[in-house]
Amino acid sequence: MTDQLIPTRRAFPADDPIFALNAEAQARKAGGESVLNATVGALLDEAGQLVVLTSVMGLWRDLTTMEVAPYAPIAGDPAFLKALVRRHWPLLDTAGAACATPGGSGALALSLRNFLEPGQSLLTTAPFWGPYATLATENGMGLVTAPWPEVGAPLDGAAWDAALRHLMKTQGRVLLWLNDPCHNPTGRSLSAADRAVLMGLLRDVATLGPVTLLLDFAYLDYTREPEAVAAALNDYATLGAEGRVLVGASLSLSKSMTLYGARCGALAFPWSTDPALQAALTQSCRGTWSNCAKAPQSLLLRLAQDGKAQERLAAEHRHWSEVLSARAQALDAALIAEGMAPLHWQGGFFVTVTTPEPEAVCGRLKADGVFTVPLPEGLRVGICGMRAAETPRFAATLRKALAVR
């Protein structure tokens, strides 16, 4: 082992657990095995190929040299930031305090650096996207959770209230990462009643100290309920405009534009014009990655000025939302046929199957060529990469794995 590596950096796994599972699945498939790979976190078509939105790539190919090569401003092109915020809240005239980031992960990382002190903890849902914990650890912070509602059940307001008040009491501030609507990894969104309860709790706790709500938006364009998504965004806008809770958003082009490799997004607080907040975000950018790629920012600006391209993109989003919905319906039907409960997907790329001993169940599934991602609460299943025709195999293999004790 390299002696120069400090002791606290010597015990990490060689690869991210999700990427390691995906690599194992691909290796076994390449070796001739029949593999069902539900670990994938990108949208695949029925042939198992990466979906790349043609409307977006048409704009990409049209970019000029000067839209690609120069440095972008440290905090990002202001017009890009405004255009990205207005994709989510069209009536807003400004991005507020905002900066460009390398994808949504960059936005999450910057929020930790600016809204918590080292040693403090952020709050998020259980279950959550695994790299949340990695981001917290890398910034010297902890992570605590409150429960995401079960299918058909309301938000556990008492548990959320206790978590919020505990953090406020112990550290004097709260940062909540909320992946809603289209929650990763459950594929379900908060109901209007759930949101009302949670926002009420946030308002109450904000009387005791600073509260920041960061909405982690990644999958909003892939939903069977676009009207519900719009209603949720309006509710969060109302909370942000009140000003008692600092409401921001982690925005990304990765899924929405299928520009995973462009690594472009933003951290935006549309209802804040605080110059100190803007200066802090800009400082973090300069001290972390300096600035972000210009090309994807230029692409979004072209999109914002091209109504026909927007129509083509919306049509592609509708199509792939229908594909995901059909996969989710097929999976629910297959689970029911095997005597298990349906999962009631509403949006996003994933669903979560609640199981006892997730690691053990995941291992038994792998032995039969079915790959999932184990979580403390169960198994994350990527319907983004699983064809509807594969769902009966998945359900039957899962039933078999659960029958082993």
Predicted feature residues:
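Short beta-strand
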Residues: 35-37, 73, 250, 341-346, ...
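Conserved glycine-rich beta-strand-loop-beta hairpin in the small C-terminal domain of fold type I
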Residues: 314-335, 339-354, 374-377
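PLP-dependent enzyme catalytic core of the Aspartate aminotransferase-like
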Residues: 86, 92, 164-170, 243, ...
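Short catalytic/ligand-binding loop motif for oxyanion handling, primarily in non-cytosolic enzymes
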Residues: 44-49, 184-187, 221-224, 257-260, ...
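Conserved core of the PLP fold type I
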Residues: 64-209, 213, 220-241
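Short hydrophobic/aromatic beta-strand micro-patches
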Residues: 268, 352-354, 382-384
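N-terminal small-domain helix-loop-helix segment of the aminotransferase-like
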Residues: 2, 11-103, 405
